[in-house]
């Protein structure tokens, strides 16, 4: 019996004491906030016009679909969540919600988010949302997370799809711009989560999750963080010279990218002691700011272009 299997039987009694706050926690609201924001950007920069009500429905369905994925993820990972200090206070490890209830909740939200998006907006977007949920729950959670150190790299595709779904909701098609947004999030994911994994490696080792620092060691992880950051900075800047986004975005991406690169170099250089811990925590925190700020510039640019004719 593995460590995870031995510990799984020590979960709190499965008598549900769930309240609204517990079900809300299943949705992973912090992750959902990032999904909502990136999806909103994908919707807003799309060409043409979508009725505001349909736009709201699209973002709501994408958010609920993301929450459904979070609930299903927690239902499937209750046995390892109880072993990790970062996740031990989630509703299932605390015995507030049973795994069966979380599974039912997640499946219900998945069904209604996909069907509502498809029926009221378009089935292209609905199909992409269904694929996103499937990829996160089945491919990443069930297939990759406990089996390979590349779990975050491949699984990151699910987190990169919301702006693509939103673009499809607005246009009923795909083009280069949403794929660029996808690539930015996709290559942002490994440095972000590997920085977290570096200072939470004991947690992952205890739970038997083969994150890169556990399998390959911290030095190899630091090198991978640096390499992925270099690729991220290049991809994030590319839409400007390619003519897809304007100079305001381009300059912002270079400034933010320089910050990411400097912090990634610091993580690579400082390998032991308090400096190493501080460097990884700073990169993790800045990476969140980086993605929000990069997408915020795109959103502000759309708003500015819409408002400018009213002012001048």
From Swiss-Prot:
It holds the Pfam family UbiA. It is found in: Cell inner membrane. It is a multi-pass membrane protein. Pathway: Porphyrin-containing compound metabolism; heme O biosynthesis; heme O from protoheme: step 1/1. Its main location: membrane. InterPro entries: Protohaem_IX_farnesylTrfase, UbiA_prenyltransferase, UbiA_prenylTrfase_CS, UbiA_sf. It comes from the Bacteria. GO terms for molecular function: protoheme IX farnesyltransferase activity. The chain crosses the membrane at residues 31-51, 52-72, 119-139, 152-172, 179-199, 225-245, 247-267, 283-303. It is an enzyme of class 2 (transferase). Keywords: Cell inner membrane, Cell membrane, Heme biosynthesis, Membrane, Transferase, Transmembrane, Transmembrane helix. It catalyses: heme b + (2E,6E)-farnesyl diphosphate + H2O = Fe(II)-heme o + diphosphate. GO terms for biological process: heme O biosynthetic process. HAMAP family: CyoE_CtaB (MF_00154). Carbon 2 of the heme B porphyrin ring is defined according to the Fischer nomenclature. Belongs to the UbiA prenyltransferase family. Protoheme IX farnesyltransferase subfamily. Converts heme B (protoheme IX) to heme O by substitution of the vinyl group on carbon 2 of heme B porphyrin ring with a hydroxyethyl farnesyl side group. This is Protoheme IX farnesyltransferase 2. It comes from Nitrobacter winogradskyi (strain ATCC 25391 / DSM 10237 / CIP 104748 / NCIMB 11846 / Nb-255). The lineage of its organism: Bacteria, Pseudomonadati, Pseudomonadota, Alphaproteobacteria, Hyphomicrobiales. The gene is ctaB2.
